[in-house]
């Protein structure tokens, strides 16, 4: 596994695919400190990397158009100071944000389940829920 994860350290950026985002591979890249650039799509499979980046508080790496995706990649590739700042933020956030903090992630998930159940119990129709916390969690990029 160490060799598998070490390969990410050879890259400067992880460029996500559009129709089907990286799932485990993007998570592994973030774990070892490799920034992931993604473009949100419409379906679940095209929004996974955006959720991962939101959960680690790096929304600046989420784009919504191909043009913005390309521009962000070019900016990061030609601006080593900005890329270094993002890598530093990723390193700082790795163990303090919900993505890799299992206890915090579980608390947020449980809070979400409580909201869903309460809506059901109150006879309300399903709708998108937001788990309010002091930390950034799965922002509504739609």
Walk through the language-model features, giving the residues of each:
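An anion/phosphate-binding loop that grips the pyrophosphate of nucleotide cofactors and donors
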Residues: 11
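Catalytic binding pocket for nucleotide-activated donors in carbohydrate/polymer assembly enzymes
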Residues: 8, 17-102
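C-terminal amphipathic helix plus adjacent low-complexity
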Residues: 6, 72-142
């Amino acid at each position: 596994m160490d060799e598998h994860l070490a390969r990410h350290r050879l890259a400067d950026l992880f460029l996500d695919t559009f129709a089907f985002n990286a799932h485990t591979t993007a998570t592994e890249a973030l774990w070892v400190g490799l920034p992931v650039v993604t473009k949100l799509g419409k379906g679940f499979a095209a929004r996974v990397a955006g959720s991962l980046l939101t959960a680690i508080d790096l929304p600046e790496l989420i784009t919504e158009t191909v043009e913005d995706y390309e521009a962000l990649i070019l900016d990061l590739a030609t601006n080593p100071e900005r890329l270094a700042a993002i890598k530093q933020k990723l390193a700082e956030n790795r163990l303090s944000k919900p993505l890799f903090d299992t206890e915090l992630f579980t608390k947020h998930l449980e809070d979400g389940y409580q909201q869903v159940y309460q809506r059901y119990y109150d006879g309300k129709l399903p709708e998108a829920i937001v788990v309010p916390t002091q930390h950034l969690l799965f922002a509504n990029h739609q």
